[in-house]
A protein has these predicted regions:
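Short glycine-/acidic-enriched loop or helix-start segments at secondary-structure transitions
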Residues: 31-32, 55, 97-99
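N-terminal glycine-rich phosphate/adenylate-binding segment common to multiple enzyme folds
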Residues: 71-99
Length: 99
C-alpha cells in the first residue's frame, strides 16, 4: 500500500480507484473524501471512534470504525478492501489516547 504524497497531480484523475482515508477529528477528512470523489475516485473510510464526524459514513463507499488503540488494524482493513493508496486526515486527540 502506498501513502498519498499530497501532490495535487497525484489525484488529477482517479478513474474509479479506491483510496483509503484513516479519519480523525475535524473537517479535513470530509474535504479529503470530497476531493477524491470530484476526481472520479471512491473512498474507503476507516474512522477513529470518538474522533471522526458521523457524516463520513454517508459519503464513504466503504466504511469502518476502530478505536484509537486499534489504529494498527487500518492496514488490514484497507488491504481487505483492495485499497492500494491511503492517507490519514484529521486530528487525534492525545488526551483520549491515554484513557
Amino acid at each position: 500500500m502506498k501513502a498519498l504524497s499530497g501532490d495535487a497531480n497525484e489525484l488529477s484523475s482517479l478513474d474509479g480507484e479506491l483510496v483509503g482515508i484513516l479519519a480523525g477529528w475535524g473537517r479535513f477528512p470530509i474535504a479529503t473524501a470530497e476531493a477524491i470523489h470530484r476526481r472520479g475516485g471512491r473512498v474507503a473510510i476507516l474512522t477513529i471512534r470518538h474522533h471522526a464526524e458521523e457524516s463520513l459514513e454517508g459519503i464513504a463507499d466503504i466504511y469502518g470504525e476502530v478505536g484509537v488503540a486499534e489504529i494498527g488494524k487500518a492496514i488490514d482493513f484497507f488491504r481487505h478492501n483492495g485499497v492500494r493508496r491511503a492517507t490519514m486526515a484529521g486530528k487525534i486527540h492525545k488526551k483520549q489516547i491515554y484513557h
